[in-house]
Amino acid sequence: MEGVDNTNPMLTLEEGENNNPFSSLDDKTLMMMAPSLIFSGDVGPSSSSCTPAGYHLSAQLENFRGGGGEMGGLVSNNSNNSDHNKNCNKGKGKRTLAMQRIAFHTRSDDDVLDDGYRWRKYGQKSVKNNAHPRSYYRCTYHTCNVKKQVQRLAKDPNVVVTTYEGVHNHPCEKLMETLSPLLRQLQFLSRVSDL
């Protein structure tokens, strides 16, 4: 697709139980998402509002959503939508925090990208109008209930869409694996210097 920088991962933020980023936007819309959206800050549960407190998006997202520019109509701003507010408050007594979803679009030949965490595949589903199935994974850390979905786009099979649901409550395991040889070496050197 011309005019789209495919080198940067694209980001979609959604929140809620039944929000599925694959069903809400078609493939053309997903490919046209602004690659320059900036994500920064802590990803934490929001206690009092529907908007996740830890998300900070650049002013480009506001222009993108607000209708300014040629792509303004692709993502609707649901903050003033009464249905969104009803769904947000629905079940508030039952469940205090909504699962947060983050979707990354990446060009890759591999379906599963190494993100530093360990995952266990627990399912696979064929997707309507797509020759590539969607795979479902869970984080293997015993107290973490983060899930991810991995799927290729129907119109561009080189693009892998990885959707994370939830927030990890533990450090990145690959980081610890990388640091452990260094820590062992430091312990060995400290023992040698004590002699």
Curated annotation (Swiss-Prot):
SMART domains attached to this UniProt entry: WRKY (SM00774)
Location relative to the cell: Nucleus
Keyword terms of this UniProt record: DNA-binding, Nucleus, Transcription, Transcription regulation
GO molecular function: DNA-binding transcription factor activity; sequence-specific DNA binding
The name this protein goes by in its record: Probable WRKY transcription factor 56
Region (Disordered): 1-20, 70-93
Matches recorded under InterPro entries: WRKY_dom, WRKY_dom_sf, WRKY_plant
SUPFAM superfamilies associated with the record: WRKY DNA-binding domain (SSF118290)
Bridged cysteine pairs (disulfide): none
Residue ranges: DNA binding: 108-173
Species of provenance: Arabidopsis thaliana
Function field: Transcription factor. Interacts specifically with the W box (5'-(T)TGAC[CT]-3'), a frequently occurring elicitor-responsive cis-acting element.
Family per record: Belongs to the WRKY group II-c family.
Pfam families listed in its UniProt record: WRKY
Keyword Endoplasmic reticulum belongs to the record: no
Gene giving rise to this polypeptide: WRKY56
GO terms for cellular component: nucleus
Keyword Lyase: no
Transmembrane portions of the chain: none
Biased composition (Polar residues): 1-10
